[in-house]
């Protein structure tokens, strides 16, 4: 009987979607309890249950199509009573399809959270947390304002200069030396103003831009600013410096806070390390004169994930995604900067 077939289809759909909801709840629990990135991967295999991560929505779609068909019949014979009844039935069918359709939002949310947890644990990132370099806990606004005041590169916005996203971590080089690090996103906003016909300045639009960088604490080098941009730095990096290498001078602009200190520091070996560090990247590398803090600021998105979640319809595909994705620009910067600081 057709009615029995419909009942069976509804039952099968309910069972399939119930399994998906159970898997979603289990994924949330895994994400909250895992201590390491490997814990997440181990919890996903073996799964020992149906691995589906896609809602069954064929029946609601068919119901919506049938409802639309019944509604369109009204244009054939508007006065017919049966056509009018089919119009009401069509609206009811579309409404029922709407309330029974399962959106993918719960799946997308848990996958996004698993991505965040995997990134945090894989790279030891403590998001929105103060670096351990600051022994006394400070309000986020205070310690970020303190860091921005130390370097003359965080005043590029005429309206705002913010760190909407940051994370504290620790880098270890191949000799076992550890560096306290804060990775951040720098967002600044400029306004574009023109004069109207009365000669008054009016704001036309706002321009939003982003840069990304790191602070490295307790570094030995100090009082030097290096940039790949054609610009100058202001106080305290007031003294320009030209090396004996013409190609380096064409590629890098170097400034310092003390000429004698620069003469001691900028030996050929140090200049070569600078050249190697900037071989594949653009940006500013600044060593504060007094605070033993390094700041690198560039255009590469350090929080960029190599592959986003696409067409993940089961637990196996999810595990493969979480196992292989990475932060390529952050890995590259960590490798080159720890090598530079050795």
Could you say what each language-model-derived stretch is?
Residues 87-112:
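Transmembrane alpha-helices and immediately adjacent membrane-cytoplasm interface residues
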Residues 58-62, 74-92:
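Hydrophobic alpha-helical transmembrane segments
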Residues 191-200:
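GHKL/Histidine-kinase-like ATPase module
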Residues 50-71:
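Transmembrane alpha-helical segments and their cytosolic interface motifs
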Residues 16, 32-42, 108-127:
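Juxtamembrane membrane-interface segments of multi-pass membrane proteins
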Residues 2-55:
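Cytosolic juxtamembrane N-terminal segments of multi-pass membrane proteins
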Residues 117-124, 129-184, 201-342:
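Charged, low-complexity intrinsically disordered regions
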Residues 187-189:
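Polar-ligand-bearing catalytic/cofactor-coordination segments
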